[in-house]
């Protein structure tokens, strides 16, 4: 899980979702998981 000021899709399988007001990126590849900090 990377915590970043701006989250972006890294590959075509990444999805940007909003959970409890927090932007997150979920993906098949665990290295692509991100959260807006």
From Swiss-Prot:
Keywords: Ribonucleoprotein, Ribosomal protein. GO terms for biological process: translation. One of its GO terms (cellular component) is ribonucleoprotein complex. One of its GO terms (molecular function) is structural constituent of ribosome. Signal peptide: none annotated. HAMAP family: Ribosomal_bL36. Belongs to the bacterial ribosomal protein bL36 family. This is Large ribosomal subunit protein bL36. It comes from Desulfovibrio desulfuricans (strain ATCC 27774 / DSM 6949 / MB).
């Amino acid at each position: 899980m990377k915590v970043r000021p701006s989250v972006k899709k890294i590959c075509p399988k990444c999805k940007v979702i909003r959970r409890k007001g927090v932007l997150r990126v979920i993906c098949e590849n665990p290295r692509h998981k991100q959260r807006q900090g």
